[in-house]
Amino acid sequence: SLLVDGRSLGDIRQGVTLEVFGEGWSMGPLTDSMRAQLISMQGDLTFDVPWTSLGEYLDHVVSRGVATNVASFVGATTVRIHEVGFVNRPATPEELARMQDLVRQAMAEGALGVGSSLIYAPANYASTEELVALARAAGESGGMYISHMRDEGRGLLTATRELITIASQAGVPAEIYHLKAS
């Protein structure tokens, strides 16, 4: 973890100069309970969590010293947990509006866009419409949408169409990461 050892020697020795985070989950924005959970989940490597926003996290990493360049997407899962929690239900219009505001804040703090990891719960509880709304909020500041899609097997084409729908309806570029098609 860069929070424990910012030298990132394993990456630097392999020529990695940029580390990008936020593929579905990001280190902000955090509620108090999300922050407490992040602290309680630490294993042998422990670190302080003095931040609540994505921008504060990035500032914290840089202030501690880091060898690589760092950047982050804001996690669609993170903003969903922030407002909806871990329950399997659609976001209410009010929750969705707050989620969009969290994306806008993260974009103002330097996020590259929105990242989703739809193969895992609670990310897979998000509807296509929810993801369009979040991607659209990121697009207001030039952000993009990246996704580990809902399905990599028999539903691959449907999942790919969903990503294309999200990007086209939001008016943003998109990227599939962890594409595993055979």
Residue ranges and their predicted role:
Residues 1-2, 148:
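Histidine-centered divalent metal-coordination motifs
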Residues 56-57, 90-116, 122-182:
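Histidine/acidic residue-rich metal-binding segments in metalloenzymes
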